[in-house]
Amino acid sequence: VLQQMGRAVEGKSTSDELAELHGLLSGKMAEAQQNPAERTLLQRFGECLDMLQTMPEAQVGLIRRVVAVIVEGQSWDLTYFDNRSQVESDEDTLRYTYQVAGCVGEFWTDLGYETMGARFCSPARRDLMRQAGVRFGRGLQLINILRDMREDAARGRSYLCSDEVCWQNRAERFLRDGLDYGSRLGSFRLRFTVMIPALLGLSTLQLIRGRKNQARVKVPRRKVYWLMLKAAFLSVMRRAS
């Protein structure tokens, strides 16, 4: 189904294939969803495809490219652990974190330049911003992996094959790259949008480093509000490009 949805977004599905997919998504799959928002999204997938057809060609190309990468990563995730319980190399981890998150930072950067031009960020920094966007996305996904690694291991899925501390340090570097990325964007709203997940990720990492048992860590709501204020403060001034 995942690959069928990817083909539909790419515009490669026949009318019969689309009809079959819509029936599956709006029927059994939607009924099986406990989250109402996810149920609605599946039921309205056809509307998403219709909206895609109304968008500028350049934006459609960006969307199709990032969806293809994400589908590839999620498909890998669904099949890789059928006959193994741990990734075989750090390269596997880096590839996976790019496919499910790093590519989104790259996409968001490209979309920003496509729709806003120099108002998004200095054109001279485009390549650097794309690279930083990839690292930022990877950092956020690494936080998910580090936070959930005990639960994942219990299900026979380990996304890391080397020292956890090294990956914690790498995640921190990537998230700080995200803060730098956000500080260079051209408007308060853009900077604020990036600062919040970066700060939440760093706070979650601090909890991961300090946990003494198997408990799943979560940033307290009061701390989230404080981080929002901090993000607003950091977003007031734009860093020189």
Label every PLM stretch briefly.
Residues V1-L140, L146-S241:
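Catalytic cores of Mg2+-dependent Asp-rich isoprenoid enzymes
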